Amino acid sequence: MQGKKPGGSSGGGRSGELQGDEAQRNKKKKKKVSCFSNIKIFLVSECALMLAQGTVGAYLVSVLTTLERRFNLQSADVGVIASSFEIGNLALILFVSYFGARGHRPRLIGCGGIVMALGALLSALPEFLTHQYKYEAGEIRWGAEGRDVCAANGSGGDEGPDPDLICRNRTATNMMYLLLIGAQVLLGIGATPVQPLGVSYIDDHVRRKDSSLYIGILFTMLVFGPACGFILGSFCTKIYVDAVFIDTSNLDITPDDPRWIGAWWGGFLLCGALLFFSSLLMFGFPQSLPPHSEPAMESEQAMLSEREYERPKPSNGVLRHPLEPDSSASCFQQLRVIPKVTKHLLSNPVFTCIILAACMEIAVVAGFAAFLGKYLEQQFNLTTSSANQLLGMTAIPCACLGIFLGGLLVKKLSLSALGAIRMAMLVNLVSTACYVSFLFLGCDTGPVAGVTVPYGNSTAPGSALDPYSPCNNNCECQTDSFTPVCGADGITYLSACFAGCNSTNLTGCACLTTVPAENATVVPGKCPSPGCQEAFLTFLCVMCICSLIGAMAQTPSVIILIRTVSPELKSYALGVLFLLLRLLGFIPPPLIFGAGIDSTCLFWSTFCGEQGACVLYDNVVYRYLYVSIAIALKSFAFILYTTTWQCLRKNYKRYIKNHEGGLSTSEFFASTLTLDNLGRDPVPANQTHRTKFIYNLEDHEWCENMESVL
């Protein structure tokens, strides 16, 4: 018996060692995955991906004018490119939001990021498939210093590429245009799961009072991305487009030259790499966070009546959709639910109005910001790189700060739905006033020979306007590019050739008839407009204020939306939001703004006998039309905010009171009323609780199961 004890002891020791090893392995495994079991780590990862998404989106906007000149496109054409991202996103947003809410959300987000990375890489592909850029193409009269001068004295010779060859490359250019559209569609498809699934995942795992701050940080990072995108665009456009193929030391043009084309493709390669690596982090997160990392037990349940929310939220944080079909249901039966649930959501006027208001606000951003760089170039005579740099360092950081402050105010002031909608109305009014001031901040086109004033006689009737004049008829001037020069007479000419200059040092310009012959010289660039510099500085300051205040409405709008729908429908409701944002807020505005801008064109370039890009605009009409469209959209958004406010006031069912602290006079408006109580009786001074408002329509209670929907 005693002989067996050592063996038994040895076996027990081995068993204990095995158990100890297993416990140690489990401990290591737990420690290994613990870093991905924290909602704050997920927030950082989601912010990194949204930063990369915002960067690539803004980078496209920053190089639109470069693409316009590189591929000889019109503003409406580049508007189509800008809208293609939304078309791709629009195609799948509902399906991803509906089915993705029940799937592995972090992994779906990661897959979307990889698809976006592929789209970014494809966006750069046209540069490597088309011919090299020849800035002297079609302008065979350029002198030794690259200046378009009069060919009457034979100084230009017949050197240069065959114009027929350039025109034959037109078909290839059209193919590159289609490839750019396809790449943007792919980017939109990849972006589909990032925002709706990311926002719902975060909102499911944080306390309700912290949700606005987390969402505000998330959207702040999304808007901070464009700042990086514009700065990246400013850097890339200073590099010559074919710098990797040729020796740039032999170039006789600089980034300040109107013929300069920057390396627009470089930023897409960098953005593709950022998207890919930031997407990899998402594959480490679980489908739902463990209970100890998820302090959201009070998140949505406290906001709803027992009748609406009978089933408690699972401890793992995964919301089970009351409309979710059984696992045995066919795919077709599941798809049948989508239009019915969508109709059910849209029957809620608060939900519909707040989404439409958000669409109008986004429409201003999508349309106005898409052409803001072009606007700065035309109105204030800036270069593409300078315009991008200013946008990236001023307006966009202010918008980031505005979104963050909006979320912070909602959290600190404990705003309810009524308070949030009043906050949105207030910031809308202030930002609209800023847009009105833009009508008076700009520069005139100035006198342009043959376009706005006749040659040598600024008082002749408009019927005499023609860029070709007896002074340059023998110069064989071309209109396939725009290289403006400022004459000693204070008039801008389309090029040195149109000014009749017969020397590459820009002297002896025959069309400058109002000055002595020895002073008949020109200098590169447009003639400056008086007071333009002061107007630009004022515009920049007002733009920063407008961006800061206008962006503060974004987080309150999202909070109103997710607080006025059933929690089981939260992911899908966000999907409907982003669907309508794409359908109404992102796709039409660039097309509308682009077509409106083209309508103000004074002079079009020609390419192979066809109309090319606009090279000169009526700045006054441009400014009035461009800003007026934005003001109209902002005004419509205010009407929708007001309608939402009225619905919230008149159709509420009940109030939920808690003790999170009241909102006093000194804490916000320095009045005796709070945002939540404007329009109602003042809250007594000794009242320490606030009123939470939940909106439910009498005839539109939320369905409890699939059968009630079907």
Swiss-Prot record:
Gene Ontology MF terms in the entry: organic anion transmembrane transporter activity; prostaglandin transmembrane transporter activity; sodium-independent organic anion transmembrane transporter activity
GO CC annotations, alphabetized: apical plasma membrane; basal plasma membrane; basolateral plasma membrane; plasma membrane
Entry keyword set: Acetylation, Cell membrane, Disulfide bond, Glycoprotein, Ion transport, Membrane, Transmembrane, Transmembrane helix, Transport
Expressing tissues: Generally the expression of isoform 1 is higher than that of isoform 2.
Catalytic reactions on record: taurocholate(out) = taurocholate(in); glycocholate(out) = glycocholate(in)
One GO BP: transport across blood-brain barrier
Membrane-spanning ranges: 41-60, 80-100, 107-131, 175-203, 223-243, 262-286, 345-366, 387-410, 415-438, 540-562, 572-597, 631-648
Pfam families registered for this protein in UniProt: Kazal_2, OATP
The protein's name in its UniProt record: Solute carrier organic anion transporter family member 3A1
Origin species: Homo sapiens (Human)
Originating gene: SLCO3A1
